[in-house]
Curated annotation (Swiss-Prot):
Pathway: Carbohydrate degradation; glycolysis; pyruvate from D-glyceraldehyde 3-phosphate: step 3/5. GO terms for biological process: gluconeogenesis; glycolytic process. The record marks H184 as: Transition state stabilizer. It comes from Photorhabdus laumondii subsp. laumondii (strain DSM 15139 / CIP 105565 / TT01). Coiled coil: none annotated. SMART domains: PGAM. The lineage of its organism: Bacteria, Pseudomonadati, Pseudomonadota, Gammaproteobacteria, Enterobacterales. The active site is at H11, E89. Substrate binds at residues 10-17, 23-24, 62, 89-92, 100, 116-117, 185-186. Keywords: Gluconeogenesis, Glycolysis, Isomerase. It is an enzyme of class 5 (isomerase). This is 2,3-bisphosphoglycerate-dependent phosphoglycerate mutase. The gene is gpmA. Belongs to the phosphoglycerate mutase family. BPG-dependent PGAM subfamily. Its EC number is 5.4.2.11.
Length: 250
């Protein structure tokens, strides 16, 4: 049976991850730790013998720079890369820029968990005159007005991620190309939910650690056979737990 592999990687720690702030579509750089995490991810992929044919990422530099660091480690800087806003992090609306722990202290841990992890629950909207509204950003100049979010849930994130997977990425994987996707916690949760046919309740508890390669193996019909992280299991579990705890009051 022919097996095709796909690698998913959440970006390394960003400056706002480090500061425990809601980020969303805000274009925040990797922290020094995040760059090191991305390089380590590249080393793991190199040690496992991964060689890629194509890469996808978002239009946000924390994901782009994670991909750059990975490709540097596997010596494939020349690899063709397609960037799409459809792989962006979920838009966190008016929460973008706020401290997660302070927000939890104000509204309660349960409310913040619902905003962060609830399937169809959206954070408070931005207004379109807010400087954080993506309509003011030139990288989104070609988007239709209805494509510019003022907030998003995981459900609405799925509505942009899955068509992009089905129409753009999946055909490459299906023809045997080795693809890597460097994206974000929620755009990857959207894809994982779809690939694994996860329930809304199960996805609520799924936390994707920063910069740990997640490998999916597919059969000839593009059905997932199995998936697994590369790296030390205890370290990966600790990273996932840290992600889960970000939205709690101190």
């Amino acid at each position: 049976m022919a097996v095709t592999k796909l690698v998913l990687v959440r970006h390394g720690e960003s400056e706002w991850n480090r500061e425990n702030r809601f980020t969303g579509w805000t274009d925040v750089a990797l922290s020094e730790k995040g760059r090191a995490e991305a390089q380590q991810a590249g080393q793991l992929l190199k040690e496992e013998g991964f060689v890629f044919d194509f890469a996808y990422t978002s239009v946000l530099k924390r994901a782009i720079h994670t991909l750059w660091n990975i490709l540097d480690q596997v010596d494939q800087q020349w690899l063709p890369v397609e960037k799409s806003w459809k792989l962006n992090e979920r838009h966190y609306g008016a929460l973008q820029g706020l401290d997660k722990a302070e927000t939890a202290a104000k509204y309660g841990d349960d409310q913040v968990k619902l905003w962060r992890r609830g399937f169809a629950i959206t954070p408070p909207d931005l207004t379109k005159d807010d400087e954080r509204f993506p309509g003011h950003d030139p990288r989104y100049a070609n988007l239709k007005p209805e494509e510019l979010p003022v907030t998003e849930s995981l459900a609405t994130t799925i509505e942009r991620v899955i068509p992009y997977w089905e129409e753009v990425i999946k055909p490459r994987v299906a023809q045997g190309e080795k693809v890597i996707i460097a994206a974000h916690g929620n755009s990857l949760r959207a894809l994982v939910k779809y690939l694994d046919n996860m329930s809304e309740e199960t996805i609520l508890e799924l936390n994707i650690p920063t910069a740990v390669p997640l490998v999916y193996e597919f059969d000839e019909n593009m059905k997932p056979i199995k998936h697994y992280y590369l790296g030390n299991a205890d370290e990966i579990a600790a990273k996932a737990a840290a992600v889960a705890n970000q939205g709690k009051a101190k």
